């Protein structure tokens, strides 16, 4: 059982609000389900941290946590969380990395946690760029050893961002877990799964802004190494999304299918923590 109020305690908590929201409003912003509640702070689980405030390029005040590596840092992980709650729950996926000598920067998108503003796909892209810019302005971060890790919506955002980022030369690798391939496709799937919205799946999904979808741009990640992680029992974002992204991506690329794995659940398993550490060590060896 997870020691945190994780965002996927109940997968239906993610699925049902998305279905209902799309049915009612038919706009891309339904992909964002932010909360401002602070469930915990890193010191409550024995982690040192820094409260970081920085501005997005359009002036929105953003908040995040920097978890410093214990001992000499091997690198820095820029962690992009999923669509629900905020960093105070999603820390559950990365809390173990500082003990393995990695800094972790967890920004909240606008509208989440203590970040100001209202969430949007365009705004989230600005926020990711600003988070990267913040890291590159810090003297305590090795600017040549930054890896981006995105889960679920954060993975979809990360793919689009890395393909277009003004800082892509500083992204040593991109890792996604449970990322969906296309906003309209995932919307259709959720609408199809609920009897009330089933007849509306096609007309409503066509109202979704697909401009920021990862599938058309994932081939532009190259030559940055791409690792796609996906559970074969993911009921929120089916494995087919990860497979489609992998098929469309250019080399260098790698895919891990987590046997029996649900949504953003790989790093609950010690074996995948060990695999990730080995991957990071290999990527950052030069």
Where are these regions (language model features)?
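Hydrolase active-site cap/lid region
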Residues: 160-217, 265-270
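Alpha/beta-hydrolase active-site loop
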Residues: 119-139
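An N-terminal hydrophobic leader/cap segment in hydrolases
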Residues: 26-55, 62-65
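Alpha/beta-hydrolase fold nucleophile elbow
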Residues: 141-152
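Conserved alpha/beta-hydrolase
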Residues: 94-116
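Short beta-strand/loop motif that positions the catalytic acidic residue
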Residues: 221-222, 227-230, 234
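Conserved alpha/beta-hydrolase "acid-adjacent" motif
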Residues: 235-241
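Short beta-strand element of the alpha/beta-hydrolase
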Residues: 74-82
């Amino acid at each position: 059982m997870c020691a945190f109020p994780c965002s996927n305690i109940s997968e239906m908590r993610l699925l049902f609000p998305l279905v209902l929201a799309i049915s009612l409003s038919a706009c891309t912003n339904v992909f964002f389900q932010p909360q401002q509640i602070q469930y915990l702070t890193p010191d409550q689980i024995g982690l040192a941290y820094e409260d970081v405030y920085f501005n997005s390029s359009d002036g929105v005040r953003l908040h995040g946590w920097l978890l410093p590596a214990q001992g000499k840092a091997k690198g820095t992980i820029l962690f992009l969380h999923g669509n629900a709650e905020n960093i105070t729950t999603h820390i559950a996926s990365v809390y173990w990395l500082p003990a393995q000598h990695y800094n972790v920067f967890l920004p909240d998108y606008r509208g989440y946690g203590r970040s100001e503003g209202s969430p949007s796909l365009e705004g989230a892209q600005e926020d990711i760029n600003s988070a990267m810019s913040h890291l590159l302005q810090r003297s305590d971060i090795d600017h040549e050893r930054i890896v981006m890790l995105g889960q679920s919506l954060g993975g979809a955002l990360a793919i689009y961002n890395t393909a277009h980022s003004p800082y892509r030369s500083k992204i040593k690798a991109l890792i996604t877990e449970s990322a969906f391939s296309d906003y309209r496709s995932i919307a259709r799937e959720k609408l199809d799964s609920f009897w009330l919205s089933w007849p509306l799946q096609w007309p409503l999904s066509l109202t979704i802004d697909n401009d920021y979808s990862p599938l058309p741009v994932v081939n532009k990640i190259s030559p940055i190494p791409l690792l796609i992680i996906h559970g074969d029992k993911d009921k929120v974002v089916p494995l087919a999304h990860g497979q489609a992204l992998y098929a469309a991506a250019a080399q260098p690329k790698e895919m891990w299918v987590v046997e029996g794995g649900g949504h953003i659940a790989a790093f609950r398993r010690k074996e995948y923590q060990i695999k990730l550490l080995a991957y990071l060590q290999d990527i950052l060896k030069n």
